[in-house]
């Protein structure tokens, strides 16, 4: 993971950071998403290291293949849907603190994700924010 990029995200609706220092993954604060799977509501914590698929579930089951409804843990709004993944699940977007969007598939276990920038300067800001290890 030495050459990986650290992703810091915020809610695209309320603008509050989604980083949770109380739940660590890959030795870094996790990305905290509220989720609803079936009738259960809980949290999914994702690694902030781009390309790491480490995650932790709290209050909901870690069931491979299930589609997760994802919400901001602060304002409760659902994250915007951008398109449908090849696996037929919705792709949601989280706002990067440096600018731009990270899009992730909402199906547990699907590894489809991407970084998108409207302004190329936001991409440069993200890369410049990384230290020499790439982990900030």
Predicted regions and their residues:
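Short Cys/His-rich Zn2+-coordinating modules
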Residues: 49-59, 63-73, 86-92
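Short metal-coordination and nucleic-acid-contact micro-motifs, chiefly zinc-binding Cys/His arrays
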Residues: 4-7, 65-68, 78-83, 99-106
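Short linker/helix segments within small regulatory modules
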Residues: 25-28, 62-66, 88-104
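Short cysteine-rich clusters marking metal-coordination/redox-active sites
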Residues: 11-14, 72-75, 85, 105-107
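Short functional micro-motifs and their immediate structural scaffolds
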Residues: 16-20, 77-80, 90-95, 110-115
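Short metal-binding segments enriched for Cys and/or His
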Residues: 36-61, 101-126
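N-terminal alpha-helical interaction blocks
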Residues: 1-50, 134-135
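C-terminal engagement modules used by replication, chromatin/transcription, nuclear envelope/ESCRT
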Residues: 128-136
